[in-house]
Amino acid sequence: MRLKGVLALFSFFTAIPIKSNASLEEIAEYSYISPLIIGISLALIESAVYVLLYRILEALAGIVLLGVVELLRGFNHLDGLLDLGDALMIKGDRERKIKALKDVEIGSGGIGLLLVYLSIQIVALLKLGFSFYTIFHLISSNVLSMTIGLYILSTISPIPESNLGKIFHNKLKGKSTVLLLELIPFISLYNIIVFLVFYMIMHKICRSLGGSSGDIAGASITLSFPLFLLTNEITNLNYSLLSILCYLFLHLH
């Protein structure tokens, strides 16, 4: 049952073709380990693809990697970003905002937030460069972004309209400390600041909507990834356990 739940994380969070008949409750139960299992797995695939692309396209490899990143995620989180953008643009009561959040049509708010995401993501991927640290930048960013999405679900009560939010909140509400502990090897002082500021912004958004949801978590994962990646690139993971290990590896060999 445990292996079934872990494998189901791949089919739920990614487009990797792993068959699973696990229920949503089983997936939610093991979702607290997905930042490590899914985050690192995605980063390794992205790194391998990027290395191959860089040999052909050099700096432009980052642009192509943008498509790879979203393909690996099956565009699931991107849908949440579009829905949240529409909800944020609605003026008025909570009911109207929730209606926009659940609406399948894409409005100007969704397109606007998508453009914000793409702008940051393109800058981050173009700045990725090619060095020994590249893979660690991607690992850290994937782990951090997945963690913040799940941390939101674990610490903020779900909106009544979100069945997925309720299930994940019930399974994760006792795992918030575990989620933070998973970050220790991958987070730097600068990314702690980004994490806290991003969480506070999303907490305020959740309050205006009446709680968290799967869409909000997905939007958080999507939008925070390029922010963490850009921070990693600028600071080179300074003062993180991962950067210390990288430094020791490079200078001892």
Curated annotation (Swiss-Prot):
Q: Specify the protein's topology with respect to the membrane.
A: Multi-pass membrane protein
Localization, UniProt: Cell membrane
> EC?
2.7.8.26
| Cofactor dependence | Mg(2+)
Q: Which Pfam families match?
A: CobS
One GO molecular-function entry = cobalamin 5'-phosphate synthase activity
Identify which top EC class this enzyme belongs to. transferase
**Reaction equations catalysed:** alpha-ribazole + adenosylcob(III)inamide-GDP = adenosylcob(III)alamin + GMP + H(+); alpha-ribazole 5'-phosphate + adenosylcob(III)inamide-GDP = adenosylcob(III)alamin 5'-phosphate + GMP + H(+)
UniProt pathway: Cofactor biosynthesis; adenosylcobalamin biosynthesis; adenosylcobalamin from cob(II)yrinate a,c-diamide: step 7/7
**By its UniProt entry, which InterPro entries does this protein fall under?**
CobS
Job description of the protein: Joins adenosylcobinamide-GDP and alpha-ribazole to generate adenosylcobalamin (Ado-cobalamin). Also synthesizes adenosylcobalamin 5'-phosphate from adenosylcobinamide-GDP and alpha-ribazole 5'-phosphate.
| The protein's name in its UniProt record | Adenosylcobinamide-GDP ribazoletransferase
The uppermost taxa in this organism's lineage are: Archaea, Thermoproteota, Thermoprotei, Sulfolobales, Sulfolobaceae
Per the record, the gene is cobS
